[in-house]
Amino acid sequence: ADFVFMESKKAKLFVNSPNAIDGNRIEKCDTSCAAFQSEEAGLADFTGSEDEILSQIRELVSILPANNEDDMSYSECEDDLNRICSDIENCVGATDLALAQISDDNFFMEVKKDYDPSMVTGFIRLNGMTVGCVANRTEVYGENGVKEGEYDAVLSYRGCEKAEKFVSFCDAFNIPLLTLVNVKGYKASKCTERR
């Protein structure tokens, strides 16, 4: 599937049930739950309540082309393409907020939000056209404006994998891509070296 939606409380996704994994019990680590599949496995792109999921599906379908030859991923735009983004300098580390600032009507739909939050992937609209976005992120802010996380300005294996899959999707559907990058290099870890 191109995009996976999971209801956060009852949905389950697994190859092997959590109890079939050696040394694991469902009470210890529920590898089939939406949180695990979105945060650790990176399989779930969107999670939420049933109403939130239905809303996310409608929103995603409204911005994507019907197929790779369709160029109907446009919408009427009343927002000025040349408007000033007065607060964008405060979004240097929080690139999800920067993308929302430059988008038509501040629209930004983040994909795989919970999987490696140091890499942002998602869709914006520019002059009515759907544009895929990839950006590294060094700061995460909650809905209340409080900083919830901080990351080094380096690329991780999981972040690169997340970006690569998103870029491949955009390429397959001829969706233009915008990249915002501010990195010093690659994350120095055994995981990075193994990959």
Predicted regions located by residue number:
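Structured core elements
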Residues: V4-M6, F14, T47, A98-Q101, ...
